UniProtKB/Swiss-Prot annotation:
Organism lineage string: Bacteria, Pseudomonadati, Pseudomonadota, Gammaproteobacteria, Pasteurellales
Highest rank taxon of the organism: Bacteria
EC annotation from Swiss-Prot or TrEMBL: 2.5.1.75
Pfam families to which the protein is assigned, alphabetical: IPPT
Transmembrane segments: none
Binding sites annotated in the UniProt record for ATP: 2-9
Protein name per UniProt: tRNA dimethylallyltransferase
Amino acid sequence: MGPTASGKTDLAIALRQTLPVEVISVDSALIYKGMDIGTAKPSKAELELAPHRLIDILDPSESYSAMNFREDALREMAEITASGRIPLLAGGTMLYYKALLEGLSPLPSADPEIRAEIEAKAEQIGWSGLHRELLAIDPIAGKRINPNDSQRINRALEVFYITGKTMTELTAQQGDSLPYNVLQFAIAPQDRAVLHQRIEQRFYKMMELGFQQEVEKLRARSDLHKDLPSIRCVGYRQMWEYLDGDISLDEAIYKGICATRQLAKRQITWLRGWNSEITWLDSLDPTSSKLKMIEKIAQNSIKL
């Protein structure tokens, strides 16, 4: 696990060359086909060295949930262990990790009629008005959800209208835990400034590789729009705004870099607050040092 641009892919590839592991991607952006540059998807050469499961499994027009991920990951893990190898989960979508490790709370399925009612109400009082309503119903979720995040506001209210219980109440009820012995490692630079620099450098590199053209191709599709989960991914959202004429290219790049840094901050905060035992690895340490530490801990825990 680790924040974006921390070196997770490079370490996963090195582990694939060293240990009997198979990589499973834990990334809510890498699941989408045709979204390669802006997601920093592993290259063809990298995937030849270390094939990643759960990459390129959906069209950008489709949605994917933590429940979907848990089901898919458990299936892949069963196949890997049946072949005598070890599942190596690598990525930065912390909600997916949480769902996999702890199971899912009993949240109801989406109800199109209730969602339509919420959206109709949003047209009358705005999403900010609905956010105030959410704060009154579920203060914890309301404080956590951004007033501009219509998707999450809609879902939180929908859950309450369906069940009569708040999202906070329901998510406190855990599902089935993971039936595996799990070793958890987090990778990040100790110096936050280093991570910020990496993020900026990578964003400009993505622009050189044709990120704008990648988004233009997506935007040309009539079935894609800015409110889809795929297009809401950091970088894509800001580039879409530029192509819509809402902001300049320089603003899109700046906002994209800022959004990526904010994502990294949330990922690190989540990891710091995670109540399970995590071994931290410094991104700047030599790969050989990180491999030795992982091998030592693994040898003490599982039979390789």
